[in-house]
């Protein structure tokens, strides 16, 4: 009962609703679940999900939200806690251009870069590529560090430069 009350107050009059939770199941529950915001969604409202989730889920949510009279964009974040605290996040957005133009001014308040990649799901796909690039870069650095000075070189110095930044 309490969850429904919170959901209704949080979403029934909102033009834009932002979510950022743990994973696909959490997003699905918050938006589509029995107490999900979709049940009190205002006509023509926009749901922006900042969770790093799957592109398949983004496409699923888009269908349900459109059917309920709203719009959806997937907009995963990059930059971590430090980026969030300093308003320097990078946001990769998937959705319609007209919907993006409505939510971008809000996201510009906490992002240094907010880019429309393509249709719904594209933001998640771009984030996946970003994560693969970061992991590949770190693996490459660690591999090369082990070869310096017959493996006696410490990789600690790399923690203090851009190699370890998100």
Enumerate the predicted regions with their spans.
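Rossmann-fold dinucleotide-binding core
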Residues: 50-135
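Rossmann-fold NAD(P) dinucleotide-binding segment
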Residues: 7-71
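Helical "substrate-binding/catalytic lid" subdomain
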Residues: 121-166
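Residue-level "edge-of-site" marker
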Residues: 9, 24, 78, 120, ...
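Short, small-residue-biased leader/transition segments that mark boundaries at the very start
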Residues: 2-6
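A general structural signal for well-ordered alpha-helical segments in protein cores
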Residues: 14, 24, 28, 34, ...
